[in-house]
């Protein structure tokens, strides 16, 4: 007795019937082999593994099952990636995000442009050029020197370096400190006159300032900018110098910056003049304005103008030779007082205007601009 399994149901048949069944099965296998020749090309393109072949030909309905498996094998999941990459797929990076180095300095040729890719390229360009001197800076600097030598500016005779120049070293350093404190938001002529009045009243030493009434100091330094606040600062600074520095002034940048009313510009200027210590460039409003007009400085990673004198100082120190750090301040301050003025600069009198990207862009007076706007409104 033989059990025949068909579609999950077991059936018993006679031995003779089983013999005829085996013969019929063999004939069907021969017929299936002939008919399967139609699929030779399909087998060549997508060969099955040995295990799949056994599954395909070991049961009824073999042709249908073979065709179904071959159709599934055609679906290759990585094929679409090759259409966009332009080269073979790097399989060990498929499951993770690309490294940052892949985007930092490389640009795919023929890739569609976008605003994000444009910003990245600008940033990379700015980073590459950071720390390198601007084009023609030597020629521009020499031209400014020649213009400055032909005409004196207020800073040449009334700058902070002239404060207390006739005093002993310790007293002179304190006078330089006071001159720097009073100089902010104040013209050199006004500042120099205030220092002269303090000297006439014996108030250029920390002992004298500490004992003086604050109201008296206010009257003597008026009309410097913020004279009320600066009188208060003078009293506090005098006390600090007496208590911490034995009547002298601080000799380090950090200690100077700890004094009330003293910022980076003043601290570097005081170190230059009082202690002959060069640790940075003194950048005031004139130096800040002129460096931006000349295109000498920009904000980190951009081509935009710097927004503060301190930001200008950091950018300028990245490329300006250190031997120029002291001279650049009075040079550009005088140039800003006489030619490259804050309002309506004299570009027509500037010998380096052809090298200045901002030349003749701020020379129009407000009245002329108003006239032009009125003309445009006329019918």
Swiss-Prot record:
Gene3D superfamilies: Helix-hairpin-Helix base-excision DNA repair enzymes (C-terminal), Hypothetical protein, domain 2. Disruption phenotype: No effect on chloroplastic glycosylase-lyase/endonuclease activity, probably due to function redundancy. The keyword Zinc-finger does not apply. It comes from Arabidopsis thaliana. Residues 1-54 form a transit peptide. Bifunctional DNA N-glycosylase with associated apurinic/apyrimidinic (AP) lyase function that catalyzes the first step in base excision repair (BER), the primary repair pathway for the repair of oxidative DNA damage. The DNA N-glycosylase activity releases the damaged DNA base from DNA by cleaving the N-glycosidic bond, leaving an AP site. The AP lyase activity cleaves the phosphodiester bond 3' to the AP site by a beta-elimination. Primarily recognizes and repairs oxidative base damage of pyrimidines. The gene is NTH1. CDD domains: ENDO3c. It is found in: Plastid, Chloroplast stroma, Chloroplast nucleoid. One of its GO terms (biological process) is base-excision repair. The lineage of its organism: Eukaryota, Viridiplantae, Streptophyta, Embryophyta, Tracheophyta. GO terms for molecular function: 4 iron, 4 sulfur cluster binding; class I DNA-(apurinic or apyrimidinic site) endonuclease activity; DNA binding; DNA N-glycosylase activity; DNA-(apurinic or apyrimidinic site) endonuclease activity; metal ion binding; oxidized pyrimidine nucleobase lesion DNA N-glycosylase activity. Belongs to the Nth/MutY family. Keywords: 4Fe-4S, Chloroplast, DNA damage, DNA repair, Glycosidase, Hydrolase, Iron, Iron-sulfur, Lyase, Metal-binding, Plastid, Transit peptide. Its EC number is 3.2.2.-, 4.2.99.18. The active site is at residue 265. Binds 1 [4Fe-4S] cluster. The cluster does not appear to play a role in catalysis, but is probably involved in the proper positioning of the enzyme along the DNA strand. One of its GO terms (cellular component) is nucleus. Residues 244-272 form the HhH domain. [4Fe-4S] cluster binds at residues 340, 347, 350, 356. The record marks 284 as: Important for catalytic activity. Its cofactor is [4Fe-4S] cluster. This is Endonuclease III homolog 1, chloroplastic. InterPro entries: DNA_glycosylase, Endonuclease-III-like_CS2, Endonuclease3_FeS-loop_motif, Endouclease-III_FeS-bd_BS, HhH-GPD_domain, HhH_base_excis_C, HhH_motif, NTH1.
């Amino acid at each position: 007795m033989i059990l025949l399994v068909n579609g999950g149901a077991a059936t018993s048949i006679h031995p003779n019937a089983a013999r005829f069944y085996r013969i019929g099965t063999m004939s069907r296998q021969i017929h299936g082999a002939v008919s399967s020749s139609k699929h030779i090309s399909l087998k060549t393109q997508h060969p099955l593994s040995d295990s799949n072949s056994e599954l395909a030909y070991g049961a009824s309905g073999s042709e249908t099952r073979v065709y179904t498996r071959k159709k599934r094998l055609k679906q290759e999941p990585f094929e679409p990636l090759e259409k966009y990459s332009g080269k073979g797929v790097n399989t060990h990076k498929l499951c993770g995000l690309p490294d940052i180095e892949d985007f930092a300095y490389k640009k795919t040729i023929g890739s569609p442009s976008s605003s994000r890719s444009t910003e990245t390229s600008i940033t990379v360009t700015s980073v590459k050029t950071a720390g390198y001197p601007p084009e023609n800076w030597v020629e521009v600097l020499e031209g400014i020197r020649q213009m400055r030598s032909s005409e004196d500016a207020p800073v040449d005779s009334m700058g902070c370096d002239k404060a207390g120049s006739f005093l002993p070293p310790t007293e002179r350093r304190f006078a330089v400190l006071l001159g720097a404190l009073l100089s902010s938001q104040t013209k050199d002529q006004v500042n120099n006159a205030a220092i002269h009045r303090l000297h006439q009243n014996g108030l250029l030493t920390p002992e004298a300032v500490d004992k003086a009434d604050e109201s008296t100091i206010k009257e003597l330094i008026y009309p410097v900018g913020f004279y009320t606040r600066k009188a208060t600062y003078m009293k506090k600074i005098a006390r600090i110098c007496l208590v911490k520095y034995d009547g002298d002034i601080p000799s380090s940048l950090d200690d100077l910056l700890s004094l009330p009313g003293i910022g980076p510009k003043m601290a570097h200027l005081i170190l230059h003049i009082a202690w002959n210590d060069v640790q940075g460039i003194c950048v005031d409003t004139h130096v800040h304005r002129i460096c931006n007009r000349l295109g000498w400085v920009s904000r980190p990673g951009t081509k935009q103008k710097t927004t503060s004198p301190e930001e200008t100082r950091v950018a300028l120190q990245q490329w300006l030779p250190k031997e120029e750090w002291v001279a650049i301040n009075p040079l550009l301050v005088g140039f800003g007082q006489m030619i490259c003025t804050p309002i309506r600069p004299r570009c027509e009198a500037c010998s380096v205007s052809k090298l200045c990207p901002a030349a003749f862009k701020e020379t129009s007076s407000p009245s002329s601009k108003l006239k032009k706007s009125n003309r445009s409104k006329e019918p």
